[in-house]
UniProtKB/Swiss-Prot annotation:
This is Con-Ins G3b. Venom insulins constitute about 1/25 of the total venom of C.geographus. It is found in: Secreted. Disulfide bonds join C38-C99, C50-C112, C98-C103. SUPFAM superfamilies: Insulin-like. The modification Histidine amide is found at H51. Pfam families: Insulin.
Amino acid sequence: MTTSFYFLLVALGLLLYVCQSSFGNQHTRNSDTPKHRCGSELADQYVQLCHGKRNDAGKKRGRASPLWQRQGFLSMLKAKRNEAFFLQRDGRGIVEVCCDNPCTVATLMTFCH
C-alpha cells in the first residue's frame, strides 16, 4: 500500500507542476512583448484595443472633405488614387507591421484613432 501511495503522490505532484508551469506563464509575460498577430487574432486584438475606431489619416491631417472635392480634380480615378496614397502609413499596412513582422501592443495602437 505504501508503494502505491508514493506513486500517487508523485503523480499528483507532477500534475500540479505541469499545470502551474503552463498557466503561470500567462501572468509573467510582458504584454508589450513584440508578437506576430495574424488573421482573426490580429482583427480581434485591433477591435479590442481600438474599440471600433480606426486611424483615419485624413482626420489626422485635418481634411474635412475628400481630396477630389478640395482640389477640384478632373478625374475621379486620379483623385482616388492620390487619396489612397495619402492614407497609407509610410507604405506599410497593419498586416505588414504586425503579421509579417512582430509588433508590440503600442505599435498596434498606432493604427487606432
